């Protein structure tokens, strides 16, 4: 006799399904953690020992991807007490996030790519999909192997590199350092079958995206491999970001930045500009500690 309970059948009934296209009201049958059937009406007795969950009036969709999360914590820019803790699995899954990319921020002194790699692997063992970027704000990049190219090529969870530009907390990298870093990430991606992307933390400097354009003029890394994030932190930067997307680049809007360009306003501007939505992503910047640099202090 077949033991159906071993398969762990679960039937989700009556949800409004987006997959991500609108599928209307559907039932979803799951076995061993995998979807095996989607239909308008799946009988609850289709298999014995099936757990039925009534989702009438609820929305069901694939898990969200958050590509900018400080998995081992962030902050520290106003002293040790402003360091934030690492992310618990439940904080991600309760928000519907099932795929995540971890990275470092300003602090790559007391936080390290090696620790981020361990956290990333732990989340994968706990059941979600997790990757990471090597590097941090600083250029040359803090890495695990001593090379951005090697990190991306041979470390399973590393898919690219991060740095900061147009920000007083950056290392003020010149175009040649940026070009070398982006080229290493690109080649590492080719060798490792990875995206090989370079993510640029954008600050509030009037230079805005100019360092990225300078990079494009001085190396042959495709614009599709360069991803500026936090582009909605000020209006001039967002205007430049729209132009960057028109040229074929991808931009990342930070959902935790409410002004001056709120995420909803940002996506409306993208649509009005006729930019393909495939060139825009949203991420949370989760667990980062945010400071307002508005007045002089002993730390200035």
Please provide the spans of the model-predicted regions:
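Divalent metal-coordination and catalytic microenvironments
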Residues: 15, 33, 57, 68, ...
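Hydrophobic "anchor" residues on beta-strands that sit immediately upstream
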Residues: 9-10, 62-64, 197, 281
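Short amphipathic alpha-helices and their capping/turn segments at secondary-structure boundaries
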Residues: 50-51, 55-56, 147-152, 264-276
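Metal-associated gating/positioning segment near the N- to mid-region
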Residues: 45, 50, 55-118
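Active-site core of metal-dependent hydrolases
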Residues: 169, 183-290
């Amino acid at each position: 006799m077949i033991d159906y309970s071993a398969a762990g059948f679960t039937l989700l009934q009556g949800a409004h399904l987006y997959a991500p296209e609108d599928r209307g009201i559907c039932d979803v049958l799951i076995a061993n953690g995998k979807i095996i059937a989607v239909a308008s009406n799946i009988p609850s007795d289709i298999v014995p020992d099936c757990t039925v969950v009534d989702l009438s009036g609820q929305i069901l969709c694939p898990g969200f991807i958050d590509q900018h999360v400080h998995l081992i914590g962030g902050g520290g820019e106003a002293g040790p007490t402003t360091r934030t803790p690492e992310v618990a699995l439940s904080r991600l899954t309760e928000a519907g996030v099932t795929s995540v990319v971890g990275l470092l921020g300003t602090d790559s002194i007391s936080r390290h790519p090696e620790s981020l790699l361990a956290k990333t692997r732990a989340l994968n063992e706990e059941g979600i999909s997790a990757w990471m970027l090597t590097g941090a704000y600083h250029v040359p990049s803090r890495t695990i192997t001593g090379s951005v190219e090697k990190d991306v090529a041979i470390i399973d969870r590393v898919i690219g590199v991060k740095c900061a530009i147009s920000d007083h907390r950056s290392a003020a990298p010149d175009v040649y350092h940026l070009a070398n870093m982006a080229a290493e990430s690109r080649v590492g991606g080719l060798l490792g079958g990875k995206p090989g992307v370079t993510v640029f933390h954008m600050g509030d400097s009037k230079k805005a995206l100019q360092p990225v354009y300078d990079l494009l003029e001085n190396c042959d890394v495709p614009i599709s491999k360069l991803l500026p994030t936090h582009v909605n932190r000020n209006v001039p930067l967002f205007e430049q970001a729209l132009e960057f997307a028109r040229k074929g680049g991808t931009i990342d809007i930070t959902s935790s930045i409410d002004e001056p360009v709120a995420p909803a306003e940002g996506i409306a501007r993208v649509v009005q500009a006729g930019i393909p939505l495939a060139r825009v992503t949203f991420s949370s910047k989760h667990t980062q500690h945010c400071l307002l640099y508005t007045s002089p202090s002993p730390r200035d």
